[in-house]
Regions:
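Glycine-rich anion-binding loops and their surrounding alpha/beta cores
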Residues: 1-151
Length: 151
């Protein structure tokens, strides 16, 4: 990563790559990382299925399972996360930023929670998810987007 970050959330498309990536990031002296792959094939934390996480923290590697059901995510169906062209995807992102409660926003909040954990803003995933969810649903991210657009 040209940004020289020492904390990362990395999604991989195949569970077999989890440990390979963890060891690679360890060799790069990454301080804290989550490498994720969901059991429904997503390269991110899934709102529909368990997600396998390899955590690299301060040189130590451990395994975690994230289960959205235990967080009461209540996402409806996998097909709801299927994107389309860039206009469709941009519209969905705007809806999320405006606080729309749907499967897209739930997926975004789960993965934002991972970033909050790796950034050491929270130690418990459930707390990080709750924070991300409450913030997204306020619609405040859209206000921030408007400020950026007007710069």
């Amino acid at each position: 990563n040209p940004a020289l970050v020492n904390r990362q959330v990395v999604g991989v498309f195949d569970r077999k790559l989890l440990m390979i990536f963890a060891k690679g990031l360890k060799n790069l002296n990454i301080k804290f990382a989550w490498i994720v792959n969901s059991e429904d094939g997503l390269d991110e934390i899934s709102p529909y299925a368990k997600t396998n996480v390899i955590q690299l923290k301060d040189g130590k590697i451990s395994e975690i399972i994230i289960d959205a059901k235990t967080l009461n995510v209540n996402a409806e169906k996998f097909e709801n996360l299927i994107g389309d062209d860039s206009n469709f995807n941009a519209d969905k992102m705007i809806e999320i930023f405006k606080g729309k409660d749907n499967d897209f926003s739930k997926a975004v909040c789960l993965n934002a929670a991972a970033g909050l954990i790796v950034g050491e803003k929270f130690t418990e995933f459930s707390d990080a998810y709750k924070f991300a969810r409450e913030f997204i649903l306020t619609g405040k991210p859209y206000s921030h987007l408007e400020k950026i657009q007007n710069v």
